[in-house]
Amino acid sequence: MGSPRPRWGRRLARLGGRVRRSLGSVDWILSAVPGWAPAYLALWCLILLSDALSEPTLPAVRGVSLVVLAILSVHAIGQRWRGGFSKHDGAYLVLMLLGAVGSFLDTAATPLFAAAWIAGTVGLDRRTRDAPALTRCVAMIGVVGAVLSRSPWLWNAVNRLAVSLTTALFSWAGGGGLGASASGLSALLLVSPCLVWAAVRGQRHRFVPVVTAIALFLVHAGSSSLFGFSPRHRLAVELVYVALLLLLCVGVVRGQRRFAGVRRPRWWAVVPALVFLFVFACGMSWLPELAPGRRYAEPRIVLFVDHSLLGSWSTPADAAPGAAFSGANFGQFPEYAGAAGHRVVTGYEIDEERIDDVDLVVIINPGAPFSEEEKETLYAFVKSGGGLLVLGDHTNMGGIMDAVNGLTAPLGLSLAFDSAVSLDPGWSRALCVLPPFSERFRPIDVPVSIGASVDAAVHPAVAPFLVGRRAFSDPGVAENIERALLGNLAFDRGERYGDVVLAAVRYLGRGKVALFGDTSVFQSSALILSYEFTDGLIRWLTDGTGAWRAPFAGVLALLLLFGSALLLDRPDALVSGVVAIVFTAGVLCGTTIAVSPKDVGPMTGPTALIDAGHGNLIRWDPLHTSGVEGLGVNLARNGFLPFVHHKGLVGSLPSPQSVVVSVAPTRSYSQREIRDLLEWVEDGGGLIVTTGWPQSTALAPFLADIGISVSPVPLGAVRPDVVSLDVQPQLPSAWPLETSPEWAPLGSVEWDDARYTVIAERSIGLGRIVVVGDNGVFLNENLEGKDYAYVENTALLSTLLSRPRGVEDPS
């Protein structure tokens, strides 16, 4: 008799048995569905992860797609487990693992990661006789999706083609004007390689799939355009359209079984092609990205030209409470540029002498046309390496459109006589950020509002970089003078819908010209969110990298499409997965190089960091009642330059003469953040925290370290007595504070024969910490918004900001 199996061996055997039974159960479930169902599900998941639909992919939909792919992977592993692994299966397992890990990272290469994941899964499943054709289709969907999302010039050409086609076909019936995603052209292009291969390789009825797909596109575009569906119905129609396209692809794949038994690839011939694929993908992603030049970190000289500005250069300090959000105020744009290290110059004239030593010229809402001499001066300035930033607004209010188009139309950029309107209350779901800003900024960092759309010509040197996906173009009404020539701001049939360009750039010589159809991003009330974007825009427009980069990136994108198609011609599943992984590596390498951190230095002067990196209960829709624009305006009135910070506080704290305001954080500070915060306060910093008892549990470790806690006694709306304040502020939902002797009460309220502290202060070193027992006192609805202000609460904030620091007894 042999020696008994050790305990760990028995446990391992039991674990293996459980795994086999689990895999067997999944395999039994999937064996009940038709043989084409796994391939159909995989294609569906890939389309959803490619974000090719007009409706942005919701996180829940993305999560379901990843779960479905995981189930298909378990099914494939179960098939191999029961039949026995071979020496070739290790490569498929590696593909599956790499693709699965990358798909959960939510990067620019997510569709390619998913394609590699599916290729590995299909390669492991021995019952998939259509593996070569299926994985070839999957890989090309990932490649086409990545190329369209990484090449703004190519995306613009496809989008203009969709608008022209739908307008030409359906304008006679009052329809047309659909963008690439809304018309279904993006989805058709994703699956087009599969259909083209079917036409090339087929024998009988080879063109039937292509003709059928085109017919589906026309039916979908026509119904979406002519019937003017609501967003909910539009999405349903689009899902049916994509479902039929994918059924067509599955049918084509199953019709190519005779090519399943191709010979193994000659890797000595494939490897050089893969190297070129990696280099081209890296170049396509790197060339148009942010600031690849050596000058990125250097400060710029920025000239703000007042060319009969329709607006004002006022700042919040110039406006009375409640009036800061009325009108177009740009006074803080130069202030933020100066705080970022740039030298700001202002002027009224455009001539060679004035702009000779300038890096960037900024023109906002020009109310007068440009002379030919001014145009030629600006064109020559840009060609020599300068940057030109032109900001306009909706319709032709005040003649802005005529003045702007007279300057930028010869360059292929112009403002439309319309208003670009989001279907959502804000632009958080509607806005799509394209390269060169897609990897560094989110829609929340670019708070656009209602402005004009930008007509970007199809030109190798013209590229959009801000697009409204769920948005429409509402034509202006020249007779509606009382409402600034606006239309009805509602979507009507026949209006341009989907993929509306909001900002674009023209590469010219060694410089760039950027045109925005909306000035909201650069107004004083929005710069607390957009300050990093505007600084990146200033540096990118003036990096002097040359106009050849954009056309060359477009050429690389086209070469990648043709090269990938040739490389995937009749391969096996392994080659398809390797192509997807190599393409992924190139895209990630290019974007990593381009967006690697650049040392531009912190913002200078007294600043106010509004913490948004700890689950703070703040809404980011423009002027939302739970927003913080009013807080930013009041911080500016008190001499601080405010900015919202969405990341952690480690290494991000401003200078000690500044202040940090944390509104209702629901996620705890790390030990490193607590240590850095306390050291920063000791050096002279000021920290203001507003929190109620429900939110204070997240801050318990930090509050315990500094000797304070929030009591679970709801006081409701109260008006406390505040030290050094003649008026009583309004706390909408107050909670009492329990403090150690080091704390001094600043605000207290008498309730039920007891006095409760609701505002307390503690000095630590040269700085101080203030805690307010109310999570919403400094939100817009309780502080300041458009045409209203609670002067008692603005006075409270001013008092807290102006109190001396480093004093032991503030009372």
Tell me what each language-model feature is:
Residues 261-811:
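Short, surface-exposed patches at the edges or C-terminal ends of soluble domains, predominantly
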